[in-house]
């Protein structure tokens, strides 16, 4: 069954019977992430050994925009993506993304990113690395309409902790490639979120700070009633921090 998503400028709809996304009536082709590609980051090894490795865990639709907005996105070096994560368990864990960091942009600060939840519920598990140490771990809970900024120097994993399909969008600089190796080398994030609601420390990190849990922050300049795509095409200057993370500290609440 096809359902309309809450985007006012660009028409987006989703058919959960075939995991298809439609943009202005067209059906873009996604990149997919299969279970076998998450081998290094799944906690439950017994589950992984028995599960079909070609099962698709999530769908990534990169660089979506209306034709008339092509110059705006290219000129600003920004990309708009949609990610769809159907509900599933990975043995002991909820379904999750592989996890990645962003490379340094300038002044010892990595590129930032901003997400919006269009359907379902998301847990964004953020961790800050300083050398070989993790100095902060934060779980941000977000629901439909919430927008979450990934600050400079934080890696992140997205978790779908519900029985609904998680559909989220993001705006990000198009000037870099994400860095996945640190997560793979340590068998995932600093903490694993288990399907019983508990969290387990990842012993591959050694000493870890306590996990902090917060709800998505409300910011006046990111109104819930306006979707991320519309915000960008109407006020692209708001998103300079995506290419220049030094602007992040100037953002108001």
Regions found by a protein language model. Name each.
Residues 2-142, 160-253:
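Active-site region of the double-stranded beta-helix
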Residues 147-148, 152-157:
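Histidine-centered metal-chelating micro-motifs
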């Amino acid at each position: 069954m096809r359902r309309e998503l809450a985007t006012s400028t660009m028409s987006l709809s989703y058919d959960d019977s075939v995991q298809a996304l439609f943009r202005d009536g067209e059906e873009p082709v996604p990149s997919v992430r299969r279970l076998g590609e998450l081998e290094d980051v799944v906690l439950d090894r017994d589950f992984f050994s028995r599960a079909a490795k070609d099962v698709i865990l999530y769908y990534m639709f990169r660089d979506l925009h209306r034709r008339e907005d092509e110059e705006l996105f290219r000129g600003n070096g920004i990309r708009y993506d949609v990610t769809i994560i159907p509900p599933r368990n990975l043995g002991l864990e909820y379904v999750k993304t592989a996890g990645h960091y962003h490379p340094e942009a300038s002044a010892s600060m990595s590129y930032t990113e901003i997400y919006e939840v269009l359907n379902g519920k998301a847990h964004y598990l953020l961790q800050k690395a300083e050398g070989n140490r993790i100095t902060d771990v934060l779980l941000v809970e977000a629901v439909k309409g919430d927008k979450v900024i990934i600050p400079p120097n934080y890696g992140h994993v997205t978790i779908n902790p519900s029985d609904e399909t998680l559909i989220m969008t993001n705006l990000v600089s198009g000037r870099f490639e994400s860095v996945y190796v640190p997560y793979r080398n340590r068998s995932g994030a600093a903490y694993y979120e288990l399907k019983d609601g508990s969290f387990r420390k990842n012993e591959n990190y050694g000493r870890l700070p306590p996990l902090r849990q917060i709800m998505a922050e409300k910011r006046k300049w990111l109104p819930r009633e306006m979707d991320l795509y519309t915000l960008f095409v109407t006020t692209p200057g708001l998103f300079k921090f995506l290419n220049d993370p030094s602007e992040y500290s100037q953002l108001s609440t």
